[in-house]
């Protein structure tokens, strides 16, 4: 099974299944000298973890990272960093009734068609459990980016079903289980999710990620465009069905005079490009958004077929998220950070002696457009 590694100078390989003994990753290409301890992974892993609120899966994993290699006396050595997390709360019996059925909307059918065999326990390799190791690898990338360049990568839930934020404050994002930027709306979200969970249904969501402090010049033209690599990385996350960068699909209704980001000696006047033009960073905040579909693991019966092609009714038991988007911000942050670190290393390798060319336009608008 291929395609378990991504990145060029910073290459990350993940392995393991949802109900296997462990999951892990290997980070190859991290520069030496970065201080790193197992305890540093706990914060972001807990942000992603299930069981954080009644609105996520009830599965409870300790998610304690073991550093197997690549770190000596608390510092990275420049050799591959191997991380391992042992699974401790599997409940494989929940999947006994669907072992020979294809759950609609899941990868059961496509894995079966491709490999002729599949692990039905929690989706096996296709489970969102795999994203735990992306978040772990992202901890390394976030720390390196912040220390080396002052880059900060943050995400938030920007839409839950039809509900959108009525205001914005970064301080609010980490103070509620929804990563929601408007504290006053949290009771509304709680009530919405309670009703949804009782009905046995699920709902989609949107997550925004903002990378601030990124220098101009990162990325490559044509086939190595930064926005292309960000899109590919984010589309690899479970349940993601769409990616926007900057104004995204909203640019289809804009005029050129609206969309172009005018420049002055004091900075850009807007950021419809999302911080990337021609595949290369402008120095403005990078703004990306992802659309996550509603999970197909439902207690409501639905039509499907079994491995013999016979029609059956499927009801998915077990512990599942009624909205996978609620836990997605740390995952999306990690993927953005890993792509940026890889691009930073590539830029340093090819163009490290170029520096920032004059004029370097100052950033004078935040991640939200000045005309929003």
Swiss-Prot record:
GO terms for cellular component: cytosol. Signal peptide: none annotated. Keywords: Amino-acid biosynthesis, Aromatic amino acid biosynthesis, FAD, Flavoprotein, FMN, Lyase, NADP. Its EC number is 4.2.3.5. This reaction introduces a second double bond into the aromatic ring system. Homotetramer. This is Chorismate synthase. It comes from Xylella fastidiosa (strain 9a5c).
């Amino acid at each position: 099974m291929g395609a378990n590694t991504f990145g060029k100078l910073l290459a990350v390989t993940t392995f393991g299944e949802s109900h296997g003994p462990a999951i892990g990753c290997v980070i190859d290409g991290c520069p030496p000298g970065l201080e790193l301890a197992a305890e540093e992974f706990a914060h972001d892993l807990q942000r992603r973890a299930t069981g954080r609120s009644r609105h996520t899966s009830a599965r409870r994993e300790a998610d304690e990272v073991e550093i197997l290699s690549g770190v000596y006396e608390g510092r990275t050595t420049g050799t591959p960093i191997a991380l391992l997390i042992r699974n401790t709360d599997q409940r494989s019996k929940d999947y006994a009734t669907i072992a020979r059925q294809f759950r609609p909307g899941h990868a059961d059918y496509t894995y079966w068609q491709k490999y002729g065999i599949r692990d039905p326990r929690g989706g096996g390799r296709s489970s969102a459990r795999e994203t735990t190791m992306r978040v772990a690898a992202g901890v390394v990338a976030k720390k390196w980016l912040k220390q080396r360049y002052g880059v900060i990568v943050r995400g938030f839930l920007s839409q839950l079903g039809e509900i959108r934020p009525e205001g914005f404050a970064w301080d609010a994002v980490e103070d509620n289980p929804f990563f929601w930027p408007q504290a006053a709306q949290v009771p509304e979200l709680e009530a919405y999710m309670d009703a949804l969970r009782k009905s046995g249904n699920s709902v989609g969501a949107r997550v925004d990620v903002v990378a601030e402090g990124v220098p101009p010049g990162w990325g490559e033209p044509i086939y190595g465009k930064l926005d292309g690599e960000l899109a590919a990385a984010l589309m690899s996350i479970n349940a993601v069905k769409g990616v926007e960068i900057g104004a995204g699909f909203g640019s289809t209704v804009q005029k050129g005079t609206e969309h172009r980001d005018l420049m002055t000696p004091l900075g850009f006047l807007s950021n419809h490009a999302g911080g990337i033009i021609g595949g290369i960073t402008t120095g403005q905040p990078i703004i990306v958004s992802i659309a996550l579909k509603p999970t197909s693991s439902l207690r409501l019966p639905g039509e499907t077929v079994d491995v013999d092609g016979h029609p059956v009714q499927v009801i998915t038991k077990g512990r599942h998220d009624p909205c996978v988007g609620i836990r997605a911000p740390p995952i999306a942050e990690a993927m953005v950070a890993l792509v940026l670190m890889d691009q930073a290393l590539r830029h340093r390798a090819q163009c490290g002696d170029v520096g920032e060319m004059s004029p370097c336009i100052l950033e004078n608008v935040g991640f939200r457009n000045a005309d929003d």
